[in-house]
Structures are given as structure tokens and as C-alpha cells.
Amino acid sequence: MAQLSMSFLLALSLLAFTPFCSCGNNYQDGNLYPQFYDHSCPKAQAIVKSIVAKAVANEARMAASLLRLHFHDCFVKGCDASILLDSNGQIISEKRSNPNRNSVRGFEVVDEIKSALEKECPNTVSCADILALAARDSTVLRGGPSWVVPLGRRDSRGASLSGSNNDIPAPNNTFQTILTKFKKQGLDIVDLVALSGSHTIGNARCTSFRQRLYNQSGNGQPDFTLQQSYAAQLRSQCPRSGGDQNLFFLDFVSPTTFDNSYFKNLLASKGLLSSDEVLVTSSGVSRGLVQKYAENNELFFEQFAKSMVKMGNISPLTGSRGEIRKNCRRVNKS
């Protein structure tokens, strides 16, 4: 899961007209429920939405970055904001892991949200819930679906560098490896394909797909499942050496609009990452889902919303477990 500008007013208008999914969830699981802050911090969601809207208006790419933060958080020890912790004392930050190093971003936006919430209602709204809300609002601001976010997560007091290195799907993972990592989180193949659709916005670095252009299988040959004129275009900006940090749209057709173009690109053999292309080359079931979403944007939106709620429910800390951090970058002083 990886990352041009609209006016602030247009971004806000999308909030009013976006498709909505209540997703029919039972919110009793894990003690998460949408009204968690209705009395303790009634302005919480409005504060998050306002700051996310400002950040995305300043930089469209930030929407994908905030969405990715939530994904990378939930896949390591559950949705507990462990990804936000800086290295300190006994804690080795997940920001140092291979999937995150010099790649994940949006921490300053989270800091701004947390600061505003602490002023409004101190020691109340968790960093984990901030990530869940920011992911939803970012999707909406790019024209994607909305959904009701179950709330009440608490923040971890630790991080897992090994979990971040091992549990987050990598751009060059095989389909089976990616599916195994999803199943470990209680997610299935439908969730895998739908959530991969988040690549309809955002960017990837040259280093994430260079092997496809020059040495896919270790034999000095490119990945021939990649459409050749598209591959040639990519090679012009992603050479064999150098240009490691050059950015490329994950969806070159509509890179800042959340829609089903990503799936149409896959069917045309124009998925940027190997982990994108395997959705149509390695499994008949996943290819069938790609075809359905490519044909029906509404169906994609509906399933994406359901899968985001499902992902957001991975192993939350509730009750007396964890804490409500005052600063999302460090645990509270005991």
C-alpha cells in the first residue's frame, strides 16, 4: 500500500457529495463504536476533518500518505498508532523499517491534529483514532467513498520494528505472500483486492519497481507482463542506477482522483508495482474481482469502505489497555 492540487473549497465540496457507506457493521466487537467521543469530545471529528482538508489542499499527495499511515499501522500489532512513535529509550521506531524508512509521511499533519484535539479536550482522543479518521477523510477529499468509523482505540506503549519489516506487504512480494500477510490480519482476498484500490492515488519511488524494468526474475530480463510502451516510458525516468527517489503515479490516468481507474490500468497491463500486477496474473479469483471493480466504480467504493472498517478493527487496544498519548510521537511519562 504506497501515495496535483485542488482548491480548498473544491476539496470541501467533495465531503458533501461523496458516496456513503454505513457498511452494516456490528460495533460491539472490540468495544469500538462511532459515537465514542460524542460526549467527551463532540468536535473531534470536525477538527480532524478540517486539518486534513487543509493539508490535502496544500498537497494532494498527502491524502495517499495519510491513508497509507493507517494501513501500515494496522498491519503491525493492530491499529494502535505504534507507527507514530519515534525511537526513544527502549523503543525502536517502526519508521526505521524497510517499508517505512524515507517513505511514510504525514506525521506533521497528525501532530497538528493531536495538538488541536489536546486543546479542545485534553487526554481524550487517541492517536490511533486520529489515523482512522484521517484515512477516511483523505479518501473522501480525493472523491472516494465515506464510511462510519468505529472509534475507541487506545494507543500502544511500544512499537515493533520486526513486525513492520515482516508483516507489511512489499512491492515485490508474490501474490501468495501478500495474501498470507492479509490473512494473518483476519482479512481475505476480497479485502486484499479492494484495499489495493487505494493505489488509485499516491506515488511510488523508482526503487519500488525498478526490478520490473530490468531484472524481474534475476536473469537480466524485464517483466514481460508490463505493457511495453508503458515500461519504456517508465525507464526514461527510472534508470538502472540513480534516480532512486524519483516519484511515479500509481495510477497515471487519474492520479489525484479516488476512482476505479487503477483496476482498469491493471487489466491493460499497466500496473506500476509487481504487487499490483499479480492481482491479475496470479489468481483467477483476484482477477475476477479486478474486472468487477473496473466495470463498476460503485461496487468498488462499497467494498473499499467495508474493507477499511474491517482493517480498522484489527486488534484494537480498548478499555484499560494502552493509553491516550499526549504526544503521538512518544509514550506518556509514567
Can you annotate each of these PLM segments?
Residues 2-334:
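Catalytic cores of secreted/periplasmic or lumenal enzymes
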